[in-house]
A protein has these predicted regions:
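Metal-dependent nuclease catalytic cores that hydrolyze phosphodiester bonds in DNA/RNA
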Residues: 1-124, 234-243
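Short histidine-centered catalytic/ligand-binding loop motif
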Residues: 43-44, 76-79, 142-150, 191-193
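Hydrophobic (often cysteine-bearing) scaffold residues that line and stabilize catalytic clefts
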Residues: 47, 51, 154, 198
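Hydrophobic/aromatic-lined pockets within catalytic cores
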Residues: 59-63, 139-142, 163, 167
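Secondary-structure boundary elements
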Residues: 100-104, 129-134, 163-170
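Non-catalytic protein-protein interaction segments used by genome-maintenance enzymes to assemble
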Residues: 112-152
Length: 245
């Protein structure tokens, strides 16, 4: 299956390929990840995700289309809601920063497919500078929580994917803008040792996740996510459970 911008996020592509986001879904809850792949469950996009997509679309040159396709970002007076006015402010801040713009000057949304650890993968890079680096754009609340989102996993897959596709082993950077009152900007390089550790982690987990995806093993239910709550059956519990921990 040849992937394009039109079918990259489609169900058929999700069924055939692993991606970083799908891998992370399996890390959180195997049952929810499988239901999402099979088209039985879809978590609605959060406001934070829409803000990130708003900024992404500026670099892709599709901001006008994004606005047309997402009327919920506007008030009844056809003005941008507060979060998206902040996104506009972030874009203006980024445009004035030469280093940030340099890192985001590569080929936009380049798609690669490859086999890694015995399973097919797909990836889509925000900014690909051939022979130089891979850069991914992130719009976050603040810098402090950046490691909690496990972008090291993304960097590991993107670096290895580019290498397997013949582009060499390229450094991976995060071009990060914050949604603070005064937007902050910086470029973060994820160290090679961190990427190597993340890749080994993926190698250790992917066979099990692939077996669940293929139907060879039953998925585990985390019991706490929205999907698990939506399919659970009521049971009798001890009230004192709620007093523990």
């Amino acid at each position: 299956m040849k992937l394009t911008d039109d079918n990259y996020y489609g169900q058929a592509a999700s069924e055939q390929y692993f991606s970083v986001s799908q891998y992370k879904d399996f890390m959180k809850c195997e049952a929810a990840a499988l239901a999402k792949i099979q088209g039985e469950y879809n978590s609605p996009p959060t406001r934070a995700m829409l803000v990130g997509s708003f900024v992404d679309s500026f670099f892709e040159g599709t901001l006008d289309r994004f606005k047309c396709e997402n009327p919920a970002i506007f008030t009844r007076k056809s003005e941008l809601k507060a979060e998206f006015r902040k996104a506009n402010e972030i874009i203006c801040r980024i445009k004035d920063d030469s280093l940030f713009m340099q890192f985001m000057s590569g080929e936009k949304q380049k798609i690669l497919t490859f086999e890694m650890f015995g399973v097919p993968w797909k990836m889509k890079m925000d900014s690909f500078s051939e022979c130089i680096c891979i850069t991914d754009l992130k719009v976050v609340q603040n810098f402090r929580n950046l490691p909690l989102w496990r972008y090291d996993l993304q960097g590991a897959v993107y670096q290895k994917g580019a290498e397997l596709c013949g582009y060499g082993k390229l450094p991976f950077y995060l071009a990060v803008a914050t949604k603070e009152r005064v937007p902050n900007l910086d470029i973060f390089q994820i160290p090679q040792m961190t990427l190597d550790i993340a890749l080994r982690e993926i190698e250790g987990n992917i066979e099990h996740f692939a077996d669940v995806k293929r139907g060879f093993m039953e998925p585990e239910y985390c019991g706490v996510c929205d999907y698990c709550k939506s399919v659970k059956q009521a049971r009798i519990r001890n009230y004192n459970e709620l007093l523990e921990g």
